[in-house]
């Protein structure tokens, strides 16, 4: 008898549901893409978007760190207090993986540990 893939409560790699890992419908941006979005010139564009009626809140309330749109300013401010947002800030503290770091890991240079970046929650602008 063949053993089937177990899908349990604990989060070890053996027990994860493989089909859920490959689904791309609700896939969020990777951390290096969010670091790119956090640069001042890109952040300004994302936080001051034109009105888009297809997105929640007409694309006016956007969390830069989680890459999510919210319905209104109150919901966005509540999101800043959640565990999900705080976890994402903690993940973003480590600087993104670069080609130079990959070359050092392959033996072409000495290892330099990744630096920690100070990441703070974005400012919310009150719209009147």
UniProtKB/Swiss-Prot annotation:
Gene3D superfamilies: Classic Zinc Finger. A zinc finger (C2H2-type) spans 61-85. Belongs to the ZNF593/BUD20 C2H2-type zinc-finger protein family. PANTHER family: ZINC FINGER PROTEIN 593. GO terms for molecular function: nucleic acid binding; preribosome binding; zinc ion binding. Keywords: Cytoplasm, Metal-binding, Nucleus, Ribosome biogenesis, Zinc, Zinc-finger. Associates with pre-60S ribosomal particles. One of its GO terms (cellular component) is nucleolus. InterPro entries: C2H2-ZF_Maturation_Protein, Matrin/U1-like-C_Znf_C2H2, Znf_C2H2_jaz, Znf_C2H2_sf, Znf_C2H2_type. The protein is largely disordered, with the exception of the zinc finger domain. Residues 1-21 are annotated as: Disordered. Its main location: nucleus. GO terms for biological process: ribosome biogenesis. This is Zinc finger protein 593. Residues 12-21 have a biased composition (Basic residues). It is found in: Nucleus, Nucleolus; Cytoplasm.
